Structure formats: C-alpha cells, structure tokens
Amino acid sequence: MLEKLINHYSTYSGILAIEFVTLIPIIIGVVYLKHLNASMKFLLIYYTTVFIRDFISNLSAIYKINNHFLYNIFGFVEIVTVGLIYYQAVQNLKIRKWIAILIAISAFLGTFLWSSTEFSSGILTIADLCSMGISILYFNTIISELKIINILKHPLFWVSSGLIIQAAGTFFIFLFAKVVLSENVEYSIFYFYWQVRQVMYILFCLFSTIGFWVTKYDKENYV
C-alpha cells in the first residue's frame, strides 16, 4: 500500500502539495494552541478533518474506489464546523440563534441532495452559501459592536476573509458540479475547475494561518 501511495503522490504531485498546504494552518495552530479560543480550536479541528478526508480520498483513488461521497459528507462537516466556529465567537443570543437556524436549515436541505457516486452540487453549494452567510453575519456583528481595537489582530477577521474568498470562488463551480466536475466531462475541463477550487482553498489556508498567528494578540485586542 505504501508503495502505491508513493507512486500516486509522484504521479499527482499537486495533490501532495495541497496536503502540505493543509498542514501549514494545522502546524501554526498547534504551535499557538495555548492562545486559541474555542472558535479557533474548532477551526483547527476543521483543518484536521480536511487532512484526513484528503488522505482517505487518495487511498480510495489508489484502489479505484469512488471517493466523491467523502466530499459530500464533508459538505455537512463544513456546515456544522463553520457554524460552531462563529457560534462560539459571538455572545449576542439573537446572532447565535440565527447561526443555529442557518446550520439547521443548511444541513436539513443537504440531506435531500445526497449522492454517493458523484459530487453533489446541492450540498456543496449550500455549504458555500452557509459559510458566506455566517461570515458576513459575523462581520456585521463586530462592525456594529465596535469592541475590537485592531481588526488586523483579530483572528476571525482573517478566517472570515479567507472563507468568503473560498466560498465565493467555488460557488459557481459547485453549483454546476454535475457539468464541470462530472466523470463524463473532458479531463482538461475537470482539471481546470478543480485547480481553481484548489487555488481558492490555498488562499483560505493562508488567511487561516495568519488568523492562527495573530491569536497571540487577541486577548488584549478588545475595548
């Protein structure tokens, strides 16, 4: 198995690069673990699950097992994890209620759009919409409360910015996943759109890494 895995990574070096990119926020998060609040710990869990998903996905590819269901499952993981990140970050009960409602509605709708053999455009699109909606709601909350001294030293500013960039950048790709990410589409088309998705993910990783790094300033960054 190890030999097959090495050959797989040698053939598809881009896949290995993405897994290394995923490790960057994980490593920085672990380094600054003592500074992480509950929200950032959920983000660390999120990246850990991404790494596990990608590793299992590559193992499945080696043995020619359909791995699309992993990404569909992860759509639910993203909805719940992103929701928990922001639920823990706000104290306003009304905002918490809206976040909980968004999580519940998104997860509920996603169950009707499940597919185990192909990318579910419905689940992945809903996950993007949920991420953008909650991030924008959080931005609106911190702007209205005016409790943060320096926004650039606030971890969730960077996380939210990266999340919005990723979700906005992949929204139409996932919306038309049955066309551009289908097994029946030409490989060049699939590869192009998958690479765009990967670039958006790399940007999110970089923004999140900055978010983990500035956690050391966060406690003294409130009025």
Region annotations inferred by a language model:
Residues 1-223:
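Terminal, non-globular segments
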